[in-house]
Structure formats: structure tokens, C-alpha cells
Amino acid sequence: MNENEGIIIENINNDSGSTYLMNILGILIPIKIVVTIYLFSKARLPVGFARYFGRLYHFMTNPIRLGLQIAGLRGPFISQLDDNVYLGAMPMGSDVTLLFYKYKINSIVNLCDEYQGPTQHYTQYGMQQLYVPVVDHFEPDVEIIEKSIQFILKQIELGNRVYIHCKAGRGRSGAIAICWIAYSRRVSLEVAQKILLEKRKIVRKQLYKQKNVNQYYSSYCLNSNINSTTSI
């Protein structure tokens, strides 16, 4: 075998090794992405990593989310909880007019860490936003729940209507909503969950079991006169 033949064989071996490596990476990378998304959806990623991954995931998937929302495949955009409080999905700039004119909403509680909201549109309509960012799929802590409830109370005293939202109006904002119902109606968390599901069927069905929801309830609601039989 001459020198040229040796070089050719070496190049072939290198090309084969590179192709094999690319094939392995082509299998491992999609698996890693799928596993990361799964762990993210179950709040099993470290919160610091989940925060940055959630922002990237929102940027990559928001067009799909908007399409599904428009098609009505993600449930209702907005649901009314009582005379003054609404719960729903994250609003885009084009939704602010709807919130302001149709629903007479002028106060917002935004729990999206990944999205600060259409703040310029809020300013245009004189709407006030309480921004309490919580990483997607994680539960708001007790301080955030209490801060949100106090904001809602203050806005109602001022004659304003409030819109609570996260990305889909299911989990993070659902935790605020169930605490609001338990606090304002003086009912148990189990009853509050039933009321909330009647108002918005797509909220998480186990909100009343969440740790911080129960801690808030014990600290701020339990000493009130609880009516465990209040009708929906």
C-alpha cells in the first residue's frame, strides 16, 4: 500500500467516524430536548435553569400558543369569577382593547416570569399592572399570593375590575384565583376549587392541595368564618 492509498483509507475512516458521531448526536439531542421539556412541565428542573428555559420556551412556542388560542383549542381566553375579578390567559397588545372596553377591566395581576405583558398598551389605557413573576409550572409563594390578594382588594375598593393571568390561566394564576375565592367568600379550599372549576373548567384540578395555597389559607383564611357548604 502506497502513501496515497493510506491517506485515502484514513480519510474514509475519519469520515465514517464523523458520520457515526453525527448520527448519535442526531438521536441524543432530540431525546435530551424532550426530557428537558417534560421535566420543565413537571417543575422538576432547578428553578434558576427553569426560569431561563421557560423564557426561551415561551419565545419559541408563543406563535403556536396564539394559533391554538385563536382556534379555541386552549379553552376560553377569559372567565369571570365574580363581579370584579376575572381569570384568563396572557393578553397580547391586541387584547387590551377587549379587556378595557368589553369587560371594563383596568387592573392586571400578571404572574408570567416569561412575559411582562403589553405594558405600553396598559399605559395608553391608564391600566395598572401588578407584576409578580413566577416561573412557569411553579407555584406562587405565600408572599406573592398575599400581595396579589391585597392588590385585588385595593383595586375593588377603588371601583376597578381586575384580570388575573399567567400563560394559560390554569396554574399560577389559578393559585391566586382559588385563594381569592376562599378569602372573599369565606369557604374551604375544597369548595373554592369546585367554584373555580365551575367558572373556568381548564384550571388545575388539584390547586386546593398545593403547599403554598394551603399555607396561605391557614395564615389568612382559616380564622375567618368558613362556610364549607356554600353553593357554587
UniProtKB/Swiss-Prot annotation:
One of its GO terms (biological process) is phospholipid biosynthetic process. The active site is at 166 (phosphocysteine intermediate). Residues 77-222 form the Tyrosine-protein phosphatase domain. Disruption phenotype: Mutants fail to aggregate to form a multicellular organism under conditions of low cell density. Pathway: Phospholipid metabolism. Its main location: membrane. Gene3D superfamilies: Protein tyrosine phosphatase superfamily. This is Phospholipid-inositol phosphatase. Its EC number is 3.1.3.-. Exhibits phosphatidylinositol-phosphate phosphatase activity. Has a preference for phosphatidylinositol 5-phosphate (1,2-diacyl-sn-glycero-3-phospho-(1D-myo-inositol-5-phosphate)) in vitro. May be involved in membrane trafficking by dephosphorylating phosphatidylinositides. SMART domains: DSPc (SM00195). The keyword Transcription does not apply. GO terms for molecular function: phosphatidylglycerophosphatase activity; phosphatidylinositol phosphate 5-phosphatase activity; phosphoprotein phosphatase activity. Belongs to the protein-tyrosine phosphatase family.
